[in-house]
Amino acid sequence: MKEYLIRRALQLIPVLILVSLFSYFIITLAPGSPADMYITDEMTEEQERQVYIDMGLDKSIPEQYLAWVKKVLQGDLGKSLYTNHQITEEIDGKLENTILLMGAAFIFALLVAVPVGLICGMKKGSAFDQFVCGLTHVFISVPGFWLAIMLILLFSLKLGWLPTSGMHSLNNDSVIDLIKHMIMPVIVLSLENIATFIKYVRSNTISQMEEEYVMTAESKGCSGRQILFGHVMKNTLLPIITLAGMRLASLVVGSFIVESVFGWPGLGRMGMTAINNRDYPLIMAYTMLSCIVLIVGNFIADILYAAADPRVKKSMLSALDEGGK
């Protein structure tokens, strides 16, 4: 198993290289130049040329990419073009804030979706099931940006129950204050995942309820509760680990919008600011960090799935043995 984990980890390296290549060339080919921020109308052609040389923009794009990779491997992500601060300083604390928000949204989505999905699956065709199915379509269709604005208008500006933006109120670092700031961003960020998880759990529950082992348990006089918690739930919820890894992408994309609307000091807001300012080094850092979060999240999901299901673990080891022959 250890050898498999090492091999899986090594497989992530080509993915990171491809993402960095694609991102760098897309950013480089975008209209404008990073040097535009430093060039003024009063500069001579020679001074403008010197700006390009100082920024390494006089070299070809492949040479610029290799120079960037060399710096990254040395732990130097460069400087922000807008603030002139080291990018490591710019992202300090922001990754943790984004992970906190995404983690809270993910846990909230599971806490809501799993019991609701199980009930819908057990009571297929009931009024509750039909209502929830309709609601999931609404959750998936509602634009996150619009919902965020509506929540701010209602709960912050009209009712005054929740703060409009930020992570903490002025001179208040309490956990309660943090939770108040998280409520609306978490709701917006988790809504689509709640709908997706409900549909997935419901579908799996219905499928499991039609299996022979359920009919056997019913014939032996087992109650619905015993069947659900003793047999159906485990088989229903196990595949959700894989789905959870796949849904990380929606959280990363969602955080980009949610953090910008609610002023949450995380990577998403930093990425939006970097794009608005055409801060290319910071955009590159945001892209790579987002990619790493996705890759690591999916890697952890694979490991958890293998640990939870012995059959998957066995197939992984078999694949590894065949690959080594």
Task: Identify the function of each model-found stretch.
Residues 2-3, 95-128, 144, 173-325:
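Alpha-helical transmembrane segments of integral membrane proteins
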Residues 15-66, 159-178:
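Hydrophobic alpha-helical transmembrane segments of membrane transport/permease proteins
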Residues 53-61, 78-87, 169-182, 275-281:
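Membrane-interfacial helix-loop-helix junctions in multi-pass membrane proteins
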Residues 43-75, 183, 262-273:
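Short hydrophobic, aromatic-rich alpha-helical segments embedded in or entering the lipid bilayer
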Residues 23-29, 70, 134-165, 188-192:
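Membrane-water interface segments at the C-terminal ends of transmembrane alpha-helices
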Residues 6-16:
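N-terminal signal-anchor/signal peptide hydrophobic helix marking the start
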Residues 12, 94, 98, 134-137, ...:
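Residue-level signal for discrete positions within transmembrane alpha-helices
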Residues 58-114:
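An internal, D/E-rich "acidic patch" concept
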